[in-house]
Amino acid sequence: MMRIAVIGAGAIGGFYGARLAASGQDVVFIARGATLSALTTNGLRVTGTEDLTLAVQATDDPTEVGPVDVVLMCTKTFQVADAAASYLPALVGPDTLVVTTQNGLQAPFVLADAIGREHVGPGLCRVWTKIAEPGVIDLMGGPQSLVVGTWDNSITPTLTAFRQALRDAGVDTVDTGDIWTALWTKVIHVVPEGAVGALLDAPLGELLGRHLAIFRRCIQEAVAVGRAHGADFPGDIVDQTLAFLSSQDPASTTSFQRDITAGRPSELEAQMGALPGLGDEVGVDTPVCDVIAETLRVRAERDAAA
């Protein structure tokens, strides 16, 4: 049995934490406010394409928990630094692996600055979930996977045990030997999907239909940036990406898109806002992404000022 702390019991942390707890792992949620109250009073529930309710351990004080084997960092990207400073000193021991679940590439680097690369488990999740209400997670179908590695792609006992824990929990995972290419493989679809969807107020099906030209171009630019940064993509990665997206719910949207549409704080600067800068670092032009990022940035500034 692994001791696992989940920071953030929202759409991502709630789902993976519930699966791991239901499979017999020793899981504790670090939460606060209405979410903490709901977890301690009503437990955690997953609804939608499955129905799971279970009593869970939850606290807002990590010193009550102490060092654990694995920490799942399931906050928004812009919350990672504060969460690391507030919670990780009490949770991280000599062999603790802190797994990122955020979209984009920033979270592992933020954690590395806080706790050292040796404790960072870059991860990528694929699951379509949303918060129905505090303590209730709506599973909308699609893949249910979490791929995890280490900073230098080495295999550690903690990583091996956690991968097995995921399998035991019914979560798909792959023993990747190149976690950074795996992360880029997600970046090239989820970042364009969220950004173009937010720009045009369109679900996935419309991006693959009437808006396919701009959507494809955005993906192509992201692929070029990823390749220049060392991602080992196959030659037909753009077509593979579009084929994967075509197999998903055409009504789906990303959490980033929903945040932008609702005028909430978003991961803009960690996702589409970061791509042009990553391109500049390696001499790759991203004209379509530049315009999309700046348009969304202006919209977010106007919403914040309203």
What does each model-identified segment do?
Residues 18, 22, 85-89, 109, ...:
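Short, well-ordered alpha-helices that flank and scaffold nucleotide-derived cofactor binding pockets
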Residues 5, 28, 97-99, 147:
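A structural signal for isolated positions on well-ordered beta-strands in alpha/beta enzyme cores
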Residues 216-306:
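NAD(P)-dependent Rossmann-like dehydrogenase/reductase catalytic/cofactor-binding core
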Residues 51-136:
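Rossmann-like NAD(P)(H) cofactor-binding subdomain of soluble oxidoreductases
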Residues 7, 30, 101-102, 123, ...:
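Structural motif
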Residues 1-51:
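NAD(P)+-binding Rossmann beta1-loop-alpha1 motif at the extreme N-terminus of oxidoreductases
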Residues 38, 90-91, 113-119, 134-236:
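Internal alpha-helical scaffold of NAD(P)-dependent oxidoreductase catalytic cores
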